[in-house]
Amino acid sequence: MILLAAASIGLAGCTKESSAISTPSSSQQNSSISTNTNVNSETSDIRNVSNTVKGDISQIDVNNIHSLKIQSNAAIITVIGDKQINQAELEVSKGNSQGMDTNVTTSIQDGTLQILLKNKLKIINTEPLPSLTIRLPYKEFKSLEIDNEVGNISVESELSVQHLNVSSGTGDVTVTDVIGMESSNISTDVGSVEFALPDQPAPLYVNLSTKIGTIDNQVALEKETNTTKIVAEELHGYVGKAQSESATLNIFTQVGEITFKN
């Protein structure tokens, strides 16, 4: 199995909506981050974290936010739901890497909070990638989308979302206690996927597939079918009673194993 110790993403829920992005807290005075903020129908915040080691934390009012979209070319990404906070918290850390410049752009448009992280390679980099951690107050989302070209993704804790889409080009994906009420699509080209169901999930149709790898299923499924072709494997079935209106969970890897558990 090829693992790239690069990035991880974690997710969680939200409760408020607005388009205000605050500047970093004063406790992070050692970070050289410039912030531009426009509080209109669209709010944007652009920062360079090339010299940020410990991490820069900013807050985002999510009263008017119904969707979240995260895009990165290389990072450790974590999204966490937290019922103890009222605003979203965004933390970016460069770590010890000296080989790249990192820029993060946040914007709010049409009810969607978009977070874009881009790294520009200066020299050959052998250090850990920058990390992006997002803590969200609990609320219901229409969609949560994460797309990371290189790096691990971790989605964890409580999150109420209708559609969950998580994708990594190279890296592991871990989803814990979070599921889309209507659909969940989890994939990685090179890496493993571990999906842990929340307690007492609603009826769910499960479709697991790997081109080169194995499937470790630890959940009792109704109408289970399992197909193995040389190095490819597929598993289908229902969690709970089979229903035509069940939510769907699709997990796919090109190269890597899948673990599905309670």
Predicted regions and their residues:
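Sec-dependent N-terminal signal peptides
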Residues: 1-6
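C-terminal motif of bacterial Sec signal peptides marking the signal peptidase cleavage site
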Residues: 10-13
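Post-signal peptide N-terminal segment of secreted/secretory-pathway proteins
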Residues: 15, 92, 102-104
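N-terminal, intrinsically disordered, polar/charged segments of Gram-positive cell-envelope systems
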Residues: 18-69, 76
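Sensor of tandemly repeated, compositionally biased sequence architecture
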Residues: 27-29, 35-37, 74, 150, ...
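Right-handed parallel beta-helix
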Residues: 50, 55-69, 76-84, 101-167, ...
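N-terminal beta-strand/beta-hairpin edge segment
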Residues: 74-75, 83-85, 90-96
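Short, surface-exposed interaction patches in beta-rich subdomains
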Residues: 175-262
